[in-house]
Each structure stands twice: as structure tokens, then as C-alpha cells.
Amino acid sequence: MTTIVSVRRNNKVVIAGDGQVSLGNTVMKGNARKVRRLYNNKVLAGFAGGTADAFTLFERFESKLQMHQGHLTKAAVELAKDWRSDRALRRLEAILAVADETASLIITGNGDVLQPEHDLIAIGSGGNYAQAAAIALLENTELDARTIAEKALNIAGDICVFTNHHHTIEELEIPQAMLPQGASA
């Protein structure tokens, strides 16, 4: 599978992923890009699961973003509705992590749209390792979002055989006006 991690801290949101594509117990590719920018570079998205399935979902999600003028939550809910009700989509095996300036969401194949706790998402085979590492770093350091995501992926890559150390990291800056009251850059 893979590991995707998203961290939101201060004025940044990051989604990062490794590059390993496995077929059974064989590594087929080590430098896949599982993290992308969508909707005029305003939305970050990463996937865990089947590569072909994820590309189908990326296309569908981007069309929902266009339809809803970039509104992340509306696009995610509409994609999840389609995923639940469309026979072909229901067969797709992937999970998406998406984020923009305002929200971070997980979209599952069961049709769930989840807003994570602690502004942290970790999905895929190494997700539990990355999540534990990122929580520890969020609670005990002042590291920025990118560094936390990178370190969490490195730890997951050291433990999970389906996660490697070839990372793709995308980052969005959150304008000061979009930050919660009392938060600073």
C-alpha cells in the first residue's frame, strides 16, 4: 500500500506521501507521485490504495471541485455520495486525504467524509506509525507542518515494508485571515 500524512500547523497545511507501488510482495515502482495539487493548486490530495482506482477518484474529485467552485467539503460530500451509490465506483479500493486553506478531510470508499482530530491525517499501510510519530511531534515540539510530515513518513518508512523513503510533499500557506482566532504564523 503506502503512507500518506497531512499536518496542519500555524499557517501551513501539508500533505506528504511515499512513492512505493507494490504488487503483492514485490515493489513495482519506488517513485510514484501519490500526492497532487488540484483545482488551480488550491487543494492538496493524496491517496492510499490501488493506483488506477485513485486516479479515477482524483478525476472525479477534481470535477466535483469545479462543480462546487473549489468548496472542499461540498465536493468531498458529493464524491462520497457518488462513491456509495455508483456500482463502478463502489469497486474502487482507495482512500483520499484532501486539504485546502480551511479544512483537512478523509474520503473513504464507504462514502464517509471525516474531519480528523488534531488537524492530522495518516492513512495507508504505514498510517498508524506516521500518526503516532506526528502526534508525538505535534505535542512535544514546535516543528513546522512540513518537518513533522517528513519525519512521520520517515518513521513509517523505517517500520512498514509497503512504505519507502521517496517522498512527495505539497504545502499550502494559509492566509492570516483564514487562521483561527488567536493563532499566529
From Swiss-Prot:
This is ATP-dependent protease subunit HslV. Belongs to the peptidase T1B family. HslV subfamily. One of its GO terms (cellular component) is HslUV protease complex. Allosterically activated by HslU binding. It catalyses: ATP-dependent cleavage of peptide bonds with broad specificity. Its main location: cytoplasm. The keyword Hydrolase applies. SUPFAM superfamilies: N-terminal nucleophile aminohydrolases (Ntn hydrolases) (SSF56235). A double ring-shaped homohexamer of HslV is capped on each side by a ring-shaped HslU homohexamer. The assembly of the HslU/HslV complex is dependent on binding of ATP. Protease subunit of a proteasome-like degradation complex believed to be a general protein degrading machinery. It comes from the Bacteria. GO terms for biological process: proteolysis involved in protein catabolic process. Keywords: Allosteric enzyme, Cytoplasm, Hydrolase, Metal-binding, Protease, Sodium, Threonine protease. It is found in: Cytoplasm. The active site is at T2. It is an enzyme of class 3 (hydrolase). Its EC number is 3.4.25.2. GO terms for molecular function: metal ion binding; threonine-type endopeptidase activity. Na(+) binds at G157, C160, T163.
